[in-house]
Amino acid sequence: MGSRFFLALFLALLVLGNEVQGTEEDDPGSSALLDTVQEHLFSYWNSAKAAAGELYQKTYLTSVDEKLRDMYSKSSAAMTTYAGIFTDQLLTLLKGE
């Protein structure tokens, strides 16, 4: 649900941020209202990002980070090995030896 909310919020901000190409209106009050709404949405978005960043910093665990880094290095080493084996097999198949 959280990702859907952020996607909907992102799309709403994208729509509000883009200007619609059409006939020009003489009413300057509507653009001021749109600017105010957009400004409030951006301030809400920035405060939500800051709160998420603070929460991440509070819950940051070095042991989990070390495990993730170790898992990444092991999996990338395994992928390098398997890619080398695949390349050797492919070259052997193409050469016909």
Swiss-Prot record:
* Disulfide bridge map: none
One GO cellular component term noted in the UniProt record for this chain: chylomicron
* Keywords (A to Z) from UniProt: Chylomicron, HDL, LDL, Lipid degradation, Lipid metabolism, Lipid transport, Secreted, Signal, Transport, VLDL
| Record localization | Secreted
InterPro entries on file: Apo-CII, ApoC-II_dom_sf
Could you confirm whether the keyword Cytoplasm appears in this record?
no
What is one GO biological process annotated to this record?
lipoprotein catabolic process
Q: Name one Pfam family in it.
A: Apo-CII
Give the signal sequence positions: 1-22
PTM summary from the entry reads: Proapolipoprotein C-II is synthesized as a sialic acid containing glycoprotein which is subsequently desialylated prior to its proteolytic processing. Proapolipoprotein C-II, the major form found in plasma undergoes proteolytic cleavage of its N-terminal hexapeptide to generate the mature form apolipoprotein C-II, which occurs as the minor form in plasma.
Q: Which domain of life is it from?
A: Eukaryota
Annotated spans, Lipid binding: 63-71
Q: Which GO terms describe its molecular function?
A: lipase inhibitor activity; lipid binding; lipoprotein lipase activator activity; molecular function activator activity; phospholipase activator activity; phospholipase binding
The UniProt function text for this chain reads: Component of chylomicrons, very low-density lipoproteins (VLDL), low-density lipoproteins (LDL), and high-density lipoproteins (HDL) in plasma. Plays an important role in lipoprotein metabolism as an activator of lipoprotein lipase.
* PANTHER family membership: APOLIPOPROTEIN C-II (PTHR16566:SF0)
State the family it belongs to: Belongs to the apolipoprotein C2 family.
The protein depicted here goes by the name Apolipoprotein C-II
The scientific name of the source species is: Rattus norvegicus
